[in-house]
Amino acid sequence: MRLILLGAPGAGKGTQAQFICEKFAIPQISTGDMLRAAVKARTELGVAAKKIMDAGGLVSDDIIIGLVKDRLTQPDCSKGYLFDGFPRTIPQAQVMKDAGVPIDYVLEIDVPFDAIIDRMGGRRVHLASGRTYHIKFNPPKVEGKDDITGDPLIQRDDDKEETVRKRLQVYDDQTRPLVEYYSSWAAQANPADKVKAPTYRKVSGTSSVEDITASIFAALK
C-alpha cells in the first residue's frame, strides 16, 4: 500500500495517518524528519540541504526527491508507505512522477473550510500540562479555565481565525490543484509513464473519527 494523503490543515490527516499505517504496517514518510535525519547523519544530500537552510533558502525539490528515494529503499518500506504533507505542489508531484516513485492511491480527506475554521478556532489549551479543550466539542467545566488547576486557558496563535484562514488559502492555492493533477493523470494514463497512475479517492472528514477511518479503509480496498 503506497499512498499520498491529502487534506487541508485541520482536516484530521495526522489522526487517520496513524490508523492507516497501523492497518497496513507501513511507515509514515515525513520530509521534515528525513531532512533532519540526513543533516544529522551528514549524508551528501544532508550537507547540501544544510547549506541551503543555513543561508535561509528553501531546499530544492530535487534534494527532497533524492531523500525520498533513499528513504524508500529502507526495509520498513517493503510493504508500502504513506506520504503526508508531500507533495505539496504540482512541480513536486511532477518531480516524483519523473523520478518513478510508485503510488497506488491518492486519498483526500475532504472537510469544508468553514468546518475547519470552527474546529481549529475553538481550541483552547492549558500550556503547562498540554491539556486541550474545545469551546463547542469539549468545553472546560468553567469557561476559560483548566478543569484541574483552574488556570486560564489560551488560544494558540496557530488556532486564531486569521492564521487558520491564511493557511487554508495557501492550501487552496498550492495543494488543492494536486487533486486535479492526479485525476487527470489517471484519466490520461500513458503506457510510456515510468510509473502507473495512482487511483484517486475522496472521503468526507466531517463525521466521527471511527466513521472516517471506516470510509478510508473501504476506499483503499
Swiss-Prot record:
Residues 122-159 are annotated as: LID. It holds the Pfam family ADK. PROSITE patterns: ADENYLATE_KINASE (PS00113). ATP binds at residues 10-15, 123, 132-133, 207. CDD domains: ADK (cd01428). Residues 30-59 are annotated as: NMP. InterPro entries: Adenyl_kin_sub, Adenylat/UMP-CMP_kin, Adenylat_kinase_CS, Adenylate_kinase_lid-dom, P-loop_NTPase. Pathway: Purine metabolism; AMP biosynthesis via salvage pathway; AMP from ADP: step 1/1. It catalyses: AMP + ATP = 2 ADP. GO terms for molecular function: adenylate kinase activity; ATP binding. GO terms for cellular component: cytoplasm. The keyword Transferase applies. Catalyzes the reversible transfer of the terminal phosphate group between ATP and AMP. Plays an important role in cellular energy homeostasis and in adenine nucleotide metabolism. Consists of three domains, a large central CORE domain and two small peripheral domains, NMPbind and LID, which undergo movements during catalysis. The LID domain closes over the site of phosphoryl transfer upon ATP binding. Assembling and dissambling the active center during each catalytic cycle provides an effective means to prevent ATP hydrolysis. HAMAP family: Adenylate_kinase_Adk. Belongs to the adenylate kinase family. Monomer. This is Adenylate kinase.
